[in-house]
């Protein structure tokens, strides 16, 4: 099998898995309990929180553990909207967002909130001039993905944060799910940031919402004591510790990982350019881990099935929104419905080998010739 769907899920790093097992075996106590086992568990999760904060260059008090980025996105967006409704009900986002963001906004729209989507430029980035036009005194939230999951476009997060300084009641939420582990990230000027471990070789079921100190959110879960007032319940110490290690490795090993991936991406672009019916949708400025393309007049789902039959795993749209509709992200950039329907995504890793790229190109060639005759 040739796995080229790392933006959907990454295999857990062996050291991360070992850390999880070690903590799970050695810390059986509840971190909320007032005895030796509970104290040991609390010390372990406190150390993990400190490590995560260092890796992200934020404060430990700003870390809220979640089950993943989808929960973090829902939590941040809905909580900010409810708590700021006395200032306004206007929210701005983009057509490039993950379904956990767009779905949260749809739910709020049904409750009377007004949602505007900012225009996307030809290179896939947010049109900052249009964003400035959309901002109003009653705008309470701007929600933007740092890196689009389908095209790999890097959004001008710092510029947006600077623009929003003039809007005292407008909060800024950034979905950093596809950014962490792919490029250096800065969270300056951002109110809430979501991320999840399974995108950077951690385990499924654990994520983080970074909440700027001083920002009030409505608790997601009410109940007993926990590591935070925002999400009550017994913390999963081993998952937190495993996320901390995965994040530490993702940050420290980033330069070497990216250098290898960039070379693979360049090789793919060169090889795919030889096929006249191939259109590369990811701009040259996209993160090298993501390469989106279309084969003219061949639905992405059809090409994906053909590759799957040959042992190659790729994605059509986000793994969380494979509903048979054209890619909103690709359509936003190309304004071509057929091209959006034909699009699919290759996502690379530092684990991807040169031989896998060779084998992929052979499988692609066979599928291309079979489907474009």
Describe the predicted segments one by one.
Residues 1-373:
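Pyridoxal 5′-phosphate
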């Amino acid at each position: 099998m040739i796995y080229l769907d790392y933006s959907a899920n990454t295999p857990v790093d062996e050291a991360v898995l070992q850390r999880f097992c070690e903590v799970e075996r050695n810390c059986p106590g509840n971190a909320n309990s007032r005895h030796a086992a509970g104290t040991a568990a609390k010390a372990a999760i406190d150390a993990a929180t400190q490590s995560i904060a260092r890796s992200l260059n934020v404060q430990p008090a700003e870390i809220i553990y979640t089950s993943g980025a989808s929960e973090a996105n829902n939590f941040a967006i809905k909580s900010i909207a409810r708590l700021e409704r006395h200032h306004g009900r206007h929210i701005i986002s983009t057509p490039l967002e993950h379904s956990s963001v767009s779905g949260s906004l749809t739910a709020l729209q049904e409750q009377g909130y007004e949602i505007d989507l900012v225009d996307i430029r030809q290179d896939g980035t947010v049109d900052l001039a249009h964003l400035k036009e959309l901002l109003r005194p009653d705008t309470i939230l701007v929600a933007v993905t740092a890196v689009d999951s389908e095209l790999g476009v890097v959004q001008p997060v710092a510029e947006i944060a600077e623009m929003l300084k003039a809007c005292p009641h407008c909060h800024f939420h950034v979905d950093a799910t596809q950014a962490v582990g792919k490029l250096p990230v800065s969270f300056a000027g951002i109110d809430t940031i979501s991320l999840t471990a399974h995108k950077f070789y951690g385990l499924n079921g654990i994520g983080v919402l970074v909440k700027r100190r001083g920002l009030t959110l409505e608790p997601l879960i009410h109940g007993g004591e926990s590591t935070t007032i925002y999400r009550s319940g017994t913390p999963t110490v081993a998952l937190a510790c495993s996320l901390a290690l995965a994040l530490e490795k993702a940050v420290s090993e980033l330069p070497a990982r990216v250098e290898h991936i960039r070379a693979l991406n360049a090789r793919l672009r060169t090889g795919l350019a030889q096929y006249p019916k191939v259109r590369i949708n990811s701009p040259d400025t996209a993160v090298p881990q993501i390469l989106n393309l279309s084969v003219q007049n061949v639905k992405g789902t059809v090409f994906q099935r053909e590759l799957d039959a040959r042992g190659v795993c790729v994605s059509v749209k986000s793994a969380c929104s494979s509903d048979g509709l054209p890619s909103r992200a690709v359509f936003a950039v190309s304004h071509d419905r057929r091209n959006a329907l034909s699009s699919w995504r290759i996502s690379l890793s530092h684990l991807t080998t040169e031989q896998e790229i060779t084998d992929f190109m052979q499988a692609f060639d066979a599928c291309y010739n079979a489907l474009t005759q």
